[in-house]
Amino acid sequence: MDNEKGTVIITSHHRNQTNHHYDTCPICYTRPGMPLVPPLNFAMIASGVYRSGHPNKQNFAFLRKLGLKTIMYFAMEDYPPEMQHFVEQEGIEVLHYKTEGNKEPFIEVNHEDISHALVKLLDKRSHPVLIHCLKGKHRIGCLVGCLRKIQRWSMTSIFDEYRKFAGTKVLADQEFIETFNHDQVPYDYEHRPGWL
């Protein structure tokens, strides 16, 4: 369903609690004993909050171990069928922020999308949550940088973490993070996570 901000919300209320039938769904499930492979650029941001690039079917067993309730996806592209099937089978709420890549200087990050995503990230009822874009670098780096401002990190530490994932060409993103007004994010104080 689309809302007025252009965010697509996909909700599935089905959470498969039974044993998975590996032979009937080879796309979504690996067999027992298969290695757990994290998505590209995977990292834990805080307890119950993870970041990465776009997951693929080799990552599904790993993601299942996280017990995700929510996924926030920042990209223009829709999920491929195998990813859509996975989130439906697992009962994961997906918030799809239709956002262009912001590596180019003329592409701006959408302040409303970042604020909306931060409200969800700061609500422990959404946890565990995975935030991802295609490569887990620039768009997610901006979101994490804004989260770190709310956590009162120094700008030096925020930019060091950003460059760890995105590299050195970050001038526009640094400016976005630096000027983002984190005091205007209306999160629910009662349901804030313990790390805030």
Q: Model features per residue range: what roles?
A:
Residues 1-131, 135, 142-196:
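Cys-dependent protein tyrosine phosphatase-like superfamily
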